[in-house]
Amino acid sequence: NFEETYETIEQIGLLTNRLPEAKKINEDIQMKLEKLQQKVENVEPKSVFFVVGVQPEIYTAGKGTYMDEMLSFLNIKNEVTEPDWPSYSAEDFIASEADVILTTYEPDIEALKANPLFATMKAVQSNQLILVDGDTTSRQGPRLAEGVESIAKAVYPELFNE
């Protein structure tokens, strides 16, 4: 989670005799996150299905995951209510009413678009299958704010038309 990320950055700073720099990194992350949260706080929440793999079943980021925390932070509803990394059958996936489907792996987008079973899904029909950077959205570290921002821009692009 975010707190563990901050703690890890400070622990590394402590171990490398660079605690002031580590604290500055955390301050910068928190400042960027605060700005992002302010951008999305009054927006109508969208729902997301965050796909992390499509073979042989559809795997997704569930409750309590780092990705789920990013979604919650951004006023985004995670369509997945199960904890951890549950798998979904095609039938259960189709039943999803997600506004947006995110993934970190480009071939997954092509696989989802190519499967006629998924053609009726809201996110597929509205072409809301979006690739986000896997390094920043699935790995905890000093690029936390970049990952959160990439999700925010993918789900709420209208807020970033500057």
Language-model region placement:
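Extracytoplasmic substrate-binding proteins
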Residues: 1-55, 77-82, 127-162
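Short, well-ordered secondary-structure micro-motifs
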Residues: 37, 59-63, 113
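Solvent-exposed helix-coil-helix hairpins and adjacent flexible coil/strand "hinge" segments
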Residues: 40-55, 69, 94-109
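Flexible, active-site-adjacent loop/turn segments at secondary-structure boundaries
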Residues: 56-59, 83-86, 110, 116-122, ...
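Alpha-helical, coiled-coil/dimerization segments enriched in small aliphatic residues
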Residues: 59-86
